[in-house]
Swiss-Prot record:
Keywords: Cell membrane, GTP-binding, Hydrolase, Lipoprotein, Magnesium, Membrane, Metal-binding, Myristate, Nucleotide-binding, Palmitate, Transducer. Residues 266-273 are annotated as: G4 motif. A lipid is attached at C3, C351 (S-palmitoyl cysteine). Belongs to the G-alpha family. G(i/o/t/z) subfamily. Its EC number is 3.6.5.-. This is Guanine nucleotide-binding protein G(o) subunit alpha.
């Protein structure tokens, strides 16, 4: 799905210009501290948003960053393939060519020896490419909602020849798509539109959530991330709970929390690209049995948005919602620009100036 400028985004740019003009006229030039909390269930795209801030508002990834992400790309790639191989057994799927079993064993052996962060040997690379090309593996990949698989599996496995090259260096997109579970709290600082941002990315898995409480004081706004594509998947940490239901429950508790009575809440309905692909094959009724609309991107996404908005029990609290694709830098740049304008407008309203 392309991420071109929508009417809503063009309006946001116009609003942005107007607010900047107001600020200049009012002579409010003292830089203000903004504390942003990134919340959401595990694997909703929070850390990818942080990486985008590094690209958009800092200097992107340094040579040192690229070096550090290289083993992560190797690991994400081979671990994804190993997860598909393991699911072949669980789901009882046969390989298109039974000789692939030897290739599968080689992949699983590398993972069990914990050599997954190392460059692929020529033999291993050939085995991985043969496996990814196998019809049984592809059938198993198409059923990935039935087991746990990294969202970037296809992206990396489609690029095996490039990632397996001797002179491989991760690209910006490779780095954006890496998946490392966030433990604890990661703080990022940057300045934009005369505001000093302190952005806190908090681990989304259930075990990490108790660490959020320290961040609750004087938060300017919360960005709550939801993986739209999680509607037909279960949690890593609890395979009986649907990911979208978990997100809704968590959003309810954040949105109506006494700590956040006066905090702006910005909802990022993320992974809209994956959702757009998935909704063609996997009906929304998997998650919402009462849904009677069509399985088009527009209708299904609007229904999910309404489910989240209905959790807000405060009549004077507004939820600002954006459909996002966290791996698309242009999309996040436009959306974050609009988010900043909301923060500025709310700040001015607080001072009676807007």
């Amino acid at each position: 799905m392309g991420c071109t400028l929508s009417a809503e985004e063009r309006a946001a740019l116009e609003r942005s210009k107007a607010i900047e003009k107001n600020l200049k006229e009012d002579g409010i030039s003292a830089a203000k501290d903004v504390k942003l909390l990134l919340l959401g269930a595990g694997e909703s795209g929070k850390s990818t948003i942080v990486k985008q801030m590094k690209i958009i508002h800092e200097d992107g990834f340094s040579g040192e960053d690229v070096k550090q992400y290289k083993p992560v790309v190797y690991s994400n790639t081979i671990q994804s393939l190993a997860a598909i191989v393991r699911a072949m057994d669980t789901l009882g799927i046969e390989y298109g060519d039974k000789e692939r079993k030897a290739d599968a064993k080689m992949v699983c052996d590398v993972v069990s020896r914990m050599e997954d962060t190392e460059p692929f040997s020529p033999e291993l690379l050939s085995a991985m490419m043969r496996l990814w090309g196998d019809s049984g593996i592809q059938e198993c990949f198409n059923r990935s909602r039935e087991y746990q698989l990294n969202d970037s599996a296809k992206y990396y496995l489609d690029s095996l020849d490039r990632i397996g090259a001797a002179d491989y260096q991760p690209t910006e997109q490779d780095i954006l798509r890496t998946r490392v579970k966030t433990t604890g709290i990661v703080e990022t600082h940057f300045t934009f539109k005369n505001l000093h941002f302190r952005l806190f990315d908090v681990g989304g898995q259930r075990s990490e959530r108790k660490k959020w409480i320290h961040c609750f004081e004087d938060v300017t706004a919360i960005i709550f991330c939801v993986a739209l594509s999680g509607y037909d998947q279960v949690l890593h940490e609890d395979e009986t709970t649907n990911r979208m239901h978990e997100s809704l429950m968590l959003f309810d508790s954040i949105c109506n929390n006494k700590f956040f009575i006066d905090t702006s809440i910005i909802l990022f309905l993320n992974k809209k690209d994956l959702f757009g692909e998935k909704i063609k094959k996997s009906p929304l009724t998997i998650c919402f049995p009462e849904y009677t609309g069509s399985n088009t991107y527009e209708d299904a996404a609007a229904y999910i948005q309404a489910q989240f908005e209905s959790k807000n029990r405060s009549p004077n609290k507004e939820i600002y919602c954006h459909m996002t694709c966290a791996t698309d830098t242009n999309n996040i740049q436009v959306v974050f620009d609009a988010v900043t304008d909301i923060i500025i407008a709310n700040n001015l309203r607080g001072c009676g100036l807007y």
